Each structure stands twice: as C-alpha cells, then as structure tokens.
Amino acid sequence: MSTPRQILAAIFDMDGLLIDSEPLWDRAELDVMASLGVDISRRNELPDTLGLRIDMVVDLWYARQPWNGPSRQEVVERVIARAISLVEETRPLLPGVREAVALCKEQGLLVGLASASPLHMLEKVLTMFDLRDSFDALASAEKLPYSKPHPQVYLDCAAKLGVDPLTCVALEDSVNGMIASKAARMRSIVVPAPEAQNDPRFVLANVKLSSLTELTAKDLLG
C-alpha cells in the first residue's frame, strides 16, 4: 500500500487558469498573422495548440504558410506584445483565483507559477491583479528547449520553491499542461474550459473541477 504523499507546494498555470487569456492569445495570433497576409481561415489545420508556447505556434503557421518579411522571432514578439495589450485592456481575471491562492496559503503551501508565457508577462499579470506577493516563485518556459507538454518548466518551478516535485500539486486548464505536470510526477488538478470539460484525456488528472471556485483543501492535499 502506497504512503500518501505530503503536499508542500501548489504550482499554478497562468493562461486559461488564472486569467481568461486563451481567447486573447488567439486574437493576438490571428491579428498578427492576418497582417502578414497569412490565410487565417486555415487555423483549423493546426494541431491542438492550447498550452503551447507562442513560438511553437508561430512555427506551425510558418510550416504551412511561410511569409516574407519579418523573422519568426519578430512575429513572436509582435504576438506577445499584442496579447499583453489585450490583457491590460480587458483584465480577465477568472473567478475563484484570489480564493484559490488564499486557500493554498491557509494550508501552509508554497505557491508557484509555471507558464509557457514570457517571464515579463507573468510579472506584469500578477502585479496587475495585486497577486505578485502571494507567489513564492515564477518559472517561464520561454527560454527552454522544450515547453509544455515537456515537464521542465514544472521541474524548474519546484526547484525555485526548494521542494521535491513529488510534493507539489499542479493546477492546469489544458491537456498539454496536465501532461507536463504528470510527467513531473506532481499531483494534478485540472480546470478545463467549458468546451473541453468532456475531453477524455483529463481522466489522467487526480481532480477535475469546472471552476477554481470549487477548489477545496482536500483537492490540494489529497
């Protein structure tokens, strides 16, 4: 019989979990692609990009519809700048975020953020919502060889928190993020978007919620 693991830290994803930014990333991506003359009506030809780093998404577009002019890195920077601008305009904090972070603190957990988005965006978003002081460590996959579903960003966040990945619970909204956290051997809580709630792949998670407002101490600690 296995011994229940002791949970010492909670690590949150950002896009789609803390802020409703996935539609904003999509809008930023399509705005920039359209400006390059790319046929954005072919968006459905791309594989599932939810939770992927934006440079990986840009590479997928380029492989199907190469453009002339700006480099892929320049295009990535344009999409990021546009996404940040849209977040600042709309301030899309999702329900239950403050309460979820507070619950983690009440349970004595360290709190981290592990995201595919750039580090300066993580800082900006947390500061925007007065949450920066609640997070003990931030980890971004922007400069890593591989982003989610690779586990490295979760392993990096655990290292920054000074804890073993086995003592972490990860909170995610995407399949790619869930796979990353499970590959890091963490307890997994998923809060899928309504349209993804019935995705059978989420059976891999330890807990599935429809909103962070439902989060309990038992969900966190097991």
Swiss-Prot record:
Keywords: Carbohydrate metabolism, Cobalt, Hydrolase, Magnesium, Manganese, Metal-binding, Zinc. It comes from the Bacteria. The active site is at residues 13, 15. Gene3D superfamilies: HAD superfamily/HAD-like, Putative phosphatase, domain 2. Its EC number is 3.1.3.68, 3.1.3.22, 3.1.3.50, 3.1.3.23. It catalyses: sugar phosphate + H2O = sugar + phosphate; 2-deoxy-D-glucose 6-phosphate + H2O = 2-deoxy-D-glucose + phosphate; D-mannitol 1-phosphate + H2O = D-mannitol + phosphate; D-sorbitol 6-phosphate + H2O = D-sorbitol + phosphate. The keyword Zinc applies. Its cofactor is Mg(2+); Mn(2+); Co(2+); Zn(2+). The keyword NADP does not apply. It is an enzyme of class 3 (hydrolase). InterPro entries: Beta-PGM-like, HAD-like_sf, HAD-SF_hydro_IA, HAD_sf, PGP-like_dom2. A divalent metal cation binds at residues 13, 15, 173. SUPFAM superfamilies: HAD-like. One of its GO terms (molecular function) is 2-deoxyglucose-6-phosphatase activity. Substrate binds at residues 13-15, 115-116, 148. Requires the presence of a divalent metal cation for activity. Can use zinc, manganese, cobalt or magnesium. Sugar-phosphate phosphohydrolase that catalyzes the dephosphorylation of D-mannitol 1-phosphate and D-sorbitol 6-phosphate. Also catalyzes the dephosphorylation of 2-deoxyglucose 6-phosphate (2dGlu6P); this is a biologically important activity in vivo since it contributes to the elimination of this toxic compound and plays an important role in the resistance of E.coli to 2-deoxyglucose. Belongs to the HAD-like hydrolase superfamily. CbbY/CbbZ/Gph/YieH family. This is Hexitol phosphatase B. It comes from Escherichia coli O157:H7. The lineage of its organism: Bacteria, Pseudomonadati, Pseudomonadota, Gammaproteobacteria, Enterobacterales.
